[in-house]
């Protein structure tokens, strides 16, 4: 994804609100990068602040995987929406696969949403280890926000 500079102010506000409530926001420390998704042979792991201009982030790196999976193991409930990287390319699926496995093994109440995340969970044979699986990623998040979904509204 490209950096959306217009979102930086909102991101700072969310980070400040989270800090005020004692909530940790986990961010990527390192990334698996390559100049093109088709060039997986040249992929390397670098700190996120050191991604070369001619490279793109295609997955989370090993330090980030370790930190995310450690925190997942301690969670009581988890909502996951969206893959960690370009998981449809095997060379860039490690982060998504590790998160899926960690959630499945965590024992936490777990929800996975979004087509790519659900596809990864299904391909790993882990769907039955999640409490709720929905291909509606954005819609799932809107429902959790309390928004009325058009398809649900018409029912009632």
Model-derived regions, located:
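Active-site loop-to-helix "anion-binding N-cap" substructures in soluble metabolic enzymes
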Residues: 1-156
């Amino acid at each position: 994804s490209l950096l959306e500079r217009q979102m930086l102010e909102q991101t700072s506000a969310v980070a400040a609100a989270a800090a005020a409530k004692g909530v940790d926001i986990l961010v990527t420390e390192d990334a698996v990068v390559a100049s093109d998704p088709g060039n997986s042979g040249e992929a390397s792991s670098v700190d996120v602040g050191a991604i070369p201009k001619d490279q793109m982030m295609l997955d989370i790196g090993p330090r980030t995987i370790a930190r995310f999976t450690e925190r997942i193991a301690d969670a009581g409930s988890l909502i996951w929406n969206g893959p960690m990287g370009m998981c449809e390319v095997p060379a860039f699926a490690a982060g998504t696969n590790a998160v899926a496995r960690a959630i499945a093994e965590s024992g936490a109440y777990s929800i996975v949403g979004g087509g790519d995340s659900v596809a990864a969970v299904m391909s790993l044979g882990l769907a039955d280890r999640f409490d709720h699986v929905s291909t509606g990623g954005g819609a799932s998040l809107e429902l959790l926000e309390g928004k009325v979904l058009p398809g649900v509204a018409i029912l009632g």
